[in-house]
């Protein structure tokens, strides 16, 4: 069900970088992400499962077939892509991440998963920034993607509008942009929400109301049909944007 207070449209703003680092260029941003995940990537999936809620619900919204192309921006360890690859008809799967370190783990995990399911879906991984997404240049695709995912990624991007713009530009008309990210937690106990926000800030993760507002405006502008679903009493939201 859609959240009645937020089932409107969307429209992002200017952009520069897609990492939580405010460095001067892409190289600085990639280095910052590598520094953050160099050690934690080894236990990332184990620790994140307890507070990155709604990821599997997001994946349930991804429609795949032998001919579909699905991209996850900020794919991290490829956890979500590996789950999609386990489907009987996963289609073509792609992952983009700013961190070389995370992609090293993603490549290893996806290779291990392929051994367990011979003939299953294969995952193409590339290093790059979200706002610089280019299907042809990065992945050699002459066609746009059918589905693009952001899973708890936009809340780590200070210049997230560029990431949304790039995703929309690389999505086919009628294609779907899916986002799961932290919400305002206003239906949760105040003490819990406050403690959660303090803890997440240690990892440079913040709820960004402006992201939600921009997604609402994107729908109002006519660029896409936008709906929101609450996860765990507004702990997080799942946004579905169908490109017009």
Model feature map: region roles:
Residues 239-244:
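C-terminal lobe and adjacent flexible extensions of AdoMet/dcAdoMet transferase-like proteins
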Residues 161-173:
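A short glycine-rich, Lys/Arg-flanked "PGG" loop and its adjoining helix->strand segment in the class I
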Residues 146-159:
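A short SAM/SAH-binding and catalytic strip from SAM-dependent methyltransferases
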Residues 178-236:
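C-terminal alpha-helical "lid/dimerization" subdomain adjacent to the S-adenosyl-L-methionine
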Residues 71-73, 77-133:
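Class I SAM-dependent methyltransferase SAM/SAH-binding core
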Residues 131-148:
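A short acidic, Gly/Pro-enriched loop at the edge of an enzyme's catalytic core
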Residues 12-65, 79-83, 192-198:
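Conserved class I S-adenosyl-L-methionine
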């Amino acid at each position: 069900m859609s959240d009645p207070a937020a089932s409107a449209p969307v429209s992002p703003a200017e952009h520069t970088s897609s990492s939580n680092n405010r460095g001067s260029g892409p190289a600085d941003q990639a280095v910052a992400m590598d520094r953050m995940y160099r050690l934690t990537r080894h236990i990332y999936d184990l620790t994140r499962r307890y507070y990155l809620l709604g990821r599997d619900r997001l994946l349930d919204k991804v429609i795949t077939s032998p001919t579909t192309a699905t991209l996850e921006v900020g794919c991290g360890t490829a956890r979500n892509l590996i789950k999609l690859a386990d489907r009987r008809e996963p289609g073509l799967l792609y992952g983009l991440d700013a961190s070389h370190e995370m992609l090293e783990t993603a490549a290893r995990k996806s290779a291990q998963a392929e051994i367990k399911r011979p003939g299953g879906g294969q995952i193409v991984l590339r290093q790059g920034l979200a706002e610089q997404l280019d299907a042809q240049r990065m992945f050699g695709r002459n066609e746009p993607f059918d589905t693009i995912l952001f899973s708890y990624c936009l809340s780590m991007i200070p210049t997230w509008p560029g990431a949304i713009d790039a995703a929309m530009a690389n999505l086919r008309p009628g294609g779907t942009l899916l986002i799961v990210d932290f919400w305002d937690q206003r239906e949760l106990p105040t003490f819990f929400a406050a403690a959660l926000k303090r803890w997440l800030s240690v990892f440079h993760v913040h709820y960004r109301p402006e992201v939600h507002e921009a997604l609402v405006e994107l729908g109002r502008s006519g660029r896409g049909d936008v709906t929101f679903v609450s996860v765990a009493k507004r702990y997080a939201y799942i946004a579905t944007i169908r490109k017009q």
